[in-house]
From Swiss-Prot:
Result of knocking out the encoding gene: Delayed transition from spikelet meristems to floral meristems, resulting in the production of multiple rudimentary glumes in an alternative phyllotaxy. Abnormal development of additional bracts leading to altered floral architecture, inculding lemma/palea-like organs in place of empty glumes and lodicules, altered number of stamens and carpels, and ectopic florets occurring in the axil of the rachilla.
Protein name, UniProt field: APETALA2-like protein 3
Source species taxonomy: Eukaryota, Viridiplantae, Streptophyta, Embryophyta, Tracheophyta
Subcellular localization: Nucleus
Extent of motif EAR: 295-299
Amino acid sequence: MVLDLNVESPGGSAATSSSSTPPPPPDGGGGGYFRFDLLGGSPDEDGCSSPVMTRQLFPSPSAVVALAGDGSSTPPLTMPMPAAAGEGPWPRRAADLGVAQSQRSPAGGKKSRRGPRSRSSQYRGVTFYRRTGRWESHIWDCGKQVYLGGFDTAHAAARAYDRAAIKFRGLDADINFNLNDYEDDLKQMRNWTKEEFVHILRRQSTGFARGSSKYRGVTLHKCGRWEARMGQLLGKKYIYLGLFDSEIEAARAYDRAAIRFNGREAVTNFDPSSYDGDVLPETDNEVVDGDIIDLNLRISQPNVHELKSDGTLTGFQLNCDSPEASSSVVTQPISPQWPVLPQGTSMSQHPHLYASPCPGFFVNLREVPMEKRPELGPQSFPTSWSWQMQGSPLPLLPTAASSGFSTGTVADAARSPSSRPHPFPGHHQFYFPPTA
């Protein structure tokens, strides 16, 4: 709907009237009227509309308007250039902003990919512990935090972190100082593994554990005593050295262990020369009766010179199948210790263990308590000589020490048909006292 506020005369309206224009009133009055274009007629038909005028609100791209007065120090103002056809102002502004950001980012330095620095230190990988009063260095490797040691200054801890970072992550690692400061270290760390390099860094620090002691390898135990322990490479966390009443005693115990394991180049709390002759490993001066260890597979003989303190005896049981055997049984507990025979020693050195007129002795070595030995009935035994143990049978002695018969006589008596076995209770224990 268009509201036409133009006032027209009656004479002019008759000449220019159209079908859409209402006729003048019948009384012929010359007053004006309001025309409402309700039927969508064009105002150009009446000639009352003004021509369309286009005004440029922004100057052309090449036009620059300088607003400066005479004698004024105000710099000329440059109007912004309009956007090109078909392109709005926001993409141009976003592009300009991106260019500005890209120009400022190199000036700010390389962005770190290892997260923020430690809050308690200006160096990366360094943390200050108020309990110990030391600067401790750590590095993350394969999802685990590796302890590099405690240091007296933050600068020393930062250098330890830098060397570990170069070893673990290469030359592109984020470090605290310049890479040129570690040229000598780069030549040395090539021949070391990660574990060995970490161990070297810890040895150069002022202590392994986070204890409340100023000495290396010493910490205050929760029981109130001082604990000494030493770190170990490739495996266990530390080696426990013991608890001590004083802090100095624990520090000296650590020094002795460090010198024993790492030599004279070990890092100690006190002067290593004060431990001369004090850290040598103790030798075992115990000698077992002057006997030589025999590595040959043979049956060792019991030592009958010592008695066993408890009621259990080691039964050196001699079973006999000869009718000449005595019916008397002498039972006495003997020691379970077995002396070791020298290599090449003849078995004739112990004749009292085999001296008997019975040709059918065989040895059965086992521990049988006296009160629990079962009662066995009569049984027969074979006439052959046998050792009821694993191994080859020992050779017979050339002579019977107690009988005086030769070997041939005893062998003939064993093969004679008249010597048939007689039943008698088995598993008798015969004790032969040593000869003077």
